[in-house]
Amino acid sequence: MEDAGPLDFAAAPTVRFGLRIEAGTTDVVRSVLLTTQIRIAAQRRPYGPDEQERLNEVFGEPSRWGTTLRSLLWKQTTLVVPPFTGSTLVDMPVECTYDLAVSSAGYLQALGDGEVPLEFLFSGTVFYSSAEGLLRTGLIPWDREAGYRLPVRVLKETMDEHFRGSAWLRVSRETFDRLYAYRATRVLGSFDETVDGLLDRAEADESDPAHEAN
């Protein structure tokens, strides 16, 4: 992996990874059908107090991280590499999500800064021309892998290109209908105003001595 950045003009938030592929021979590579499993090596970076608190939902209490802190599957992608000789640099697009029900998304959202330690595990098929001009195929060994430390800044820039200053929360249809009705009944101007009002009420109840007595 050579670099990473937001993919321009993508329909959804997408990180572009620059992948260098070396043929290792003088044969003409006609195509590569490349499958990549991308894992987050969560054990390979430190976490500040705020990050530890936010990661409680993913890994549990920090005191248990010796057994619960583990690698997370982020994505599995398939890429068709066009013909090349010797080596080539291709873009590997990886779509991002705000769906915090997915463990990897919850992990990435919890990070404040630094880098995300990633592991790329490759498999697939290479189609190439032999010296005689015959079409040959070869399998990519399962032990082919690469590491890359993705700056958290790149992730934030990628999400901001589509949802600047915003985030998305998935709720059930029933919960949404209740929230919508609450907003309509009180003639609130936006869902931000609606949620803020509910949170303010909950915080006021928690600080009320009568509430604590109950």
Predicted features, each with a name:
Residues 54-109:
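Extended, solvent-exposed segments with strong compositional bias
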Residues 173-190:
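Surface-exposed, Lys/Arg-rich phosphate-binding patches that contact polyanionic backbones
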Residues 39-50:
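Short aromatic-acidic-glycine turn motif
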Residues 18-22, 170, 180:
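Short edge beta-strand/loop segments characteristic of extracellular beta-sandwich folds
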Residues 53-62, 127-168:
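Short beta-strand elements
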Residues 18, 34-41, 90-143:
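Internal, hydrophobic beta-strand segments that form the core of beta-sheet-rich folds
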Residues 189-211:
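Short, basic amphipathic alpha-helical segments that act as recognition/interaction helices
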